[in-house]
Amino acid sequence: MAQFTLIIRSGPEATRDPNVYHFPTAQDARDATEHMMRTLLAERADAFDGKAIEIADATGHPIAVVHPYDVMPVRLH
């Protein structure tokens, strides 16, 4: 399984999650990240104001970015 890390980005600031996550594919990592963000936004709508989550591969290079508007219902955009 491939290794992925998550980076919460707010403008130029970046906070790296110290955990390493294992998924079969990058799409599986993105799907899990979208699900997690959707769950957190349902609990607290302002949880990701101005922030995004970067998914990085084992080398630390970002391979995908998930923004709140990617997972919000259309009526909240």
Residue map of PLM features:
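A broad, structure-centric signal for solvent-exposed, well-ordered loop/edge residues
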Residues: I8, T15, R30, P62, ...
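Short, mixed-charge low-complexity intrinsically disordered segments
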Residues: T39-H77
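A short, charged, amphipathic alpha-helix used as a generic interaction element across diverse proteins
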Residues: T25-A45
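Secondary-structure boundary/capping motif
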Residues: M1-Q3, M36, P62
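Short aromatic-glycine-(Arg/Gly/Cys) micro-motifs in beta-strand/loop hairpins
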Residues: M1-D17
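A short, structured loop/turn motif at beta-sheet edges
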Residues: F23-R30, D57-H61
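A short, exposed loop/beta-hairpin motif centered on an aromatic-Gly-Thr core
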Residues: T15-T25
